[in-house]
Design a protein with these regions (language model features):
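Canonical P-loop GTPase G-domain recognition
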Residues: 81, 90-142
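Walker A/P-loop
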Residues: 140, 145-146, 150
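Short amphipathic alpha-helical segments
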Residues: 65-68, 96-98, 149, 199-201, ...
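Phosphate-binding glycine-rich loops and their immediate beta-loop-alpha structural context
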Residues: 41-50, 55-108
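Well-ordered alpha-helical segments embedded in enzymatic catalytic cores
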Residues: 67-70, 124, 251
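Signal for well-folded cores of large energy- and translation-related assemblies
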Residues: 57, 72-76, 90, 96, ...
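Helix-rich effector regions associated with P-loop NTPase G domains
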Residues: 1-10, 16-45, 51, 80-82, ...
């Protein structure tokens, strides 16, 4: 983050550059110029963040816990406080959002159920933002811009539509924006993304970023246990006994399968 003094002609001079205390990143998208020797490079999303809000929707597009867990891994690996927003709950006829809220709250994450139609959850969400730099990150079409416009009507951000064919949103934000919304309160609006692969995560370390595993990993027979197939794995035993959510564990295995070693510069 930088501070600037504006000149009368609209130009500015940087007067201060804040030291970087943290940053959030992912593997760069699979596009030309975003790789080195065939390996995808690191793409920094934002720095000096107080907390992350993973924005999802219960429908249109459908809630995808495996994607949420990838966002969480990226956040945990950067030691950034992580929260989850499940938006569009006015479409949730079966109350599925309550099931997901329970799963993630039991682990220790704050979960906000929101609706821009009824303004459900807005008061508690607004209070959580105050006095902080808040990064909002999520798939295209989950309603980030609509949330911002409802929380802070003066923003008047562009809102996109959802494709009825593939349930994917269209990008309405094309770059990151740091927006001051109140005294000492900022939001970082990011473009909706189609894929999220955490950067710099090794197979042996992935379990550290599933915080419900921590109670059991010290009891594993092998110090290099990946909690996948090894005998004497206490994480697997905890899943089998219901102490760890099987849904979360299956998500862990899915991420484990896709991890490749990254080139670290």
């Amino acid at each position: 983050m930088v501070e600037i003094d504006l000149n009368k002609d609209g130009t500015g001079v940087i007067t201060k550059i804040s030291p970087r205390k943290n940053y959030l990143s992912r593997k760069a998208p699979k596009i030309k110029g975003a790789s080195f020797r065939g390996e995808r490079l690191e793409q920094i999303i934002a720095a000096n963040i107080d907390q992350l809000f993973i924005v999802t929707s219960i429908k249109h597009p459908e809630f995808n816990n495996k994607v949420v867990d990838r966002f969480i891994v990226a956040s945990e690996s950067s030691s950034i406080t992580c929260n989850i927003i499940i938006n569009k709950i006015d479409l949730d006829d079966t109350k599925t959002s309550l099931k997901w809220k329970a799963i993630y709250q039991d682990i220790g994450y704050k979960v906000f159920l929101t609706s821009t139609l009824s303004r459900h959850g807005f008061e508690s969400l607004s209070q959580s933002l105050k006095g902080k730099i808040n990064l909002f990150w999520g798939h295209s079409g989950v309603g980030k811009s609509s949330l911002f416009n409802s929380l802070y009507p003066s923003l008047n951000l562009k809102v996109g539509l959802i494709s009825s064919f593939n349930q994917k949103g269209k990008h309405t934000t094309v770059t990151n924006y740091l927006i001051k919304v109140e005294k000492d309160t900022y939001i970082i609006d990011t473009p909706g993304i189609r894929e999220i692969d955490p950067y710099g995560i090794h197979r042996r370390d992935l379990g550290h970023y599933f915080k419900e595993f921590s109670e059991f990993t010290s009891g594993c027979k092998f110090s290099t246990c990946t909690h996948n197939h090894e005998p004497g794995c206490m994480v697997i035993e905890a899943v089998q006994s219901g102490k760890i959510s099987e849904i979360r564990y299956n998500s862990y295995l899915r991420i484990l399968e896709t991890i490749e070693d990254d080139i670290i510069f």
